[in-house]
A protein has these predicted regions:
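TRNA-binding/sensing appendages of the translation machinery
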Residues: 1-73, 131
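A structural signal for short, well-ordered beta-strand segments and their strand-loop junctions
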Residues: 33-36, 92-94, 151-156, 251-252
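Beta-rich nucleic-acid/ligand-interaction surfaces
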Residues: 36-54, 153-164, 256-265, 363-369
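Acidic, His- and aromatic-enriched active-site or binding-groove loops in soluble protein domains
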Residues: 55-61, 169-194, 272-274
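Extended alpha-helical scaffolds
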Residues: 144-163, 167-179, 193
Length: 383
């Protein structure tokens, strides 16, 4: 089963408008466009364990290659080869399709094609590069003008919190504890051979989420003072005024972990709630280990970024793109055709969209029909 994208013209216009708006924001922040390959080396994806092997779409003609399941790995590989000598930090943006394989009906495999846009910030020697990335994400979504009565929630965590949890309570059963915490599975947690006091603490942590400083206070009671929590507190104190300015609610969820095994450090999702439906419109995080994997000699192996779901945003923007001025050029007598051709060239030189009807037209009703059929906003008669 394949979820093939076949867009109508309105959806195509919406996609183009969303991507154009996002690209304009990225450029203002000093980012440059890259176009990573759609085809990946399957061993690279498997070697980093970025995604489960059964979710990868391999090529029939060459089982060593696959369609990219995400953008970041391709871009990090690119900067370790083609862009290895370019000065850091690298600020890169990209648009394109990714391809997923998911479980379908009766164990069938469902192939999905998705449109993404995003940025990557590589080699920025600063303690909190997340501030720039998060600021750009908020700015990007703000420029898109979402529908009224939508609520935005910025869900944040760090893989370091899970490390704290497992270090204190994990004993020799870290993997199953981690799985139950991520899945919010109390039943599985109950089956683990673990001290009852530890189980009680883990259940408390499992459902600890909300306003960042309140959550950090609770975490401090569990783990004591820690640099990890101090750094988180500083990050939230910095981005809170920014999120308030954009009307975005921030929540810290210690057990949140992304599906892709890319990230180590800060991870996040931007969720939009509209009419009781939730849409993940962006996700991202920090992936220093991925940078080190592809280039062990990287001086500042710092990498982070985000991807935005164009497919979900298309459902949430206020309206389609505003209709641009589009002129239909008509003439009544064939002797005026040359003049009409020259007029079209003049309009094009002014960056005005114009369509020339090559057949003479003498009937105003037909003229109106031609205007509507061509999607034009006005008629210019050549006399």
């Amino acid at each position: 089963m394949t979820d093939i994208k076949e867009f109508n013209l309105l959806d195509v216009r919406k996609n183009s408008q969303i991507i154009k708006t996002l690209n304009e924001v990225y450029k203002l922040w000093g980012y440059e466009e890259v176009t990573p390959s759609t085809i990946n080396d399957i061993d690279t994806i498997k070697g980093r364990e970025v995604i489960n092997e059964d979710e990868i779409i391999s090529l029939v003609s060459n089982k060593k290659l696959c369609l990219r399941p995400e953008m970041t790995t391709s871009i990090i590989k690119l900067i370790s080869t083609r862009l290895i000598n370019k000065k850091r930090p690298l600020r890169l943006w990209n648009n394109g399709n990714i391809f997923e394989r998911k479980e379908g009906y009766k164990n069938s495999k469902k192939l999905k094609e998705k449109i993404q846009s995003g940025i990557e910030l590589i080699g920025y020697d600063t303690k909190f590069p997340e501030i720039e990335i998060i600021n750009i994400l908020f700015d990007s979504i703000d420029k898109l003008k979402l529908k009224e009565n939508t609520k935005l929630i910025f869900l944040v965590s760090t893989t370091s919190i899970m490390d704290l949890i497992l270090k204190k309570y994990g004993s020799n059963q870290s993997e199953i504890i981690k799985k139950s915490m991520i899945n919010l599975d109390q039943d599985e947690l109950n089956t683990i051979n673990l001290d009852e006091g530890f189980k009680y603490a883990l259940k408390q942590l499992m459902f600890t989420r909300g306003e960042p400083n309140e959550v950090i206070t609770k975490l401090t009671k569990h783990f004591g003072k820690s640099q990890i929590l101090d750094d988180l507190s500083f990050l939230f104190d910095t981005i809170k005024p920014i999120s308030d300015n954009y009307g975005i609610d921030i929540q810290l969820d210690p057990t949140f972990q992304p599906h892709l095994n890319l990230y180590a450090g800060i991870v996040f999702q931007l969720i939009c709630i509209n009419k009781d439906e939730k849409y993940v419109i962006a996700k991202g995080g920090r992936y220093d280990e991925l940078v080190k994997y592809f280039n062990p000699n990287e001086k500042n192996p710092i990498g982070l970024g985000f991807s935005i779901s164009i497919d979900n945003l298309r459902k949430l923007i206020k309206t389609g793109p505003k209709m641009e001025r589009k002129i239909l050029i008509l003439y009544k007598n064939k002797e005026l055709l040359s003049k009409a051709i020259n007029e079209q060239k003049r309009l094009h030189s002014l960056n005005l969209i114009s369509i020339l009807e090559l057949n003479p037209c003498k009937n105003t009703e037909i003229a109106e029909l031609l205007k509507n059929n061509n999607g034009c906003s006005e008629i210019l008669w050549i006399k």
